[in-house]
């Protein structure tokens, strides 16, 4: 029996940080993001003769685009993508983020739905980096919404976006509706019997299977085309 630690990068999709006029959390996604991080940190899954765990890095647009953040100089407007710089000339924070993405084995995207699509902060953050950093690695999609639809239209929009980057998405989705009724701000669960919670393990099982399969193929073939 052996163990394998997957380097897992989580991209948070929304940069919105203001309470709506009708009240509630200033950032609806904080709870589900914290929960996903906790679940990844404690996860130990059996896959064949391997025990799979996760080493997690989170990229949040509130941090990434903030003053001093990895992409602060370029900004959410995507003025200077990483792949436009010559080797060694990208800002240090951007280069460090690029190397983390390059070293990742798989990705999870946790995002809200904006106008039946994905948030601009997410497409800008991930789009700062070329497909060579994402390719031949799987991704999992987790969406959320205060509505009954669970951000499912963002999930649909994400599939071609992730495919173009090269990090093909697992078929299973995690779409969490009425998300404020499921999670507290700190990621604790309000009702452990909520059946929506069962979505995440299904997504992770597929992402882990794909990640290990792709890693083994790269090891066998000595690289990717």
Go through each PLM region and give its residues.
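A general structural signal for alpha-helical elements within enzymatic catalytic domains
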Residues: 38-45, 130, 163, 212
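Glycine-rich phosphate/pyrophosphate-binding loop and the adjoining helix
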Residues: 3-4, 48, 168-225
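Mobile beta-alpha loop/short-helix "lid" or hinge segments that flank ligand
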Residues: 56-78, 131, 165-186
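A short, gly/pro- and small-residue-rich
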Residues: 122-134
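Proline-centered loop/turn at the N-terminus of a beta-strand
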Residues: 7, 137-138
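Short, glycine-/small-residue-rich phosphate/pyrophosphate-handling segment
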Residues: 138-180, 195-198
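N-terminal beta1-alpha1-beta2 submodule of the flavodoxin-like/Rossmannoid cofactor-binding fold
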Residues: 1-124, 197-201, 219-225
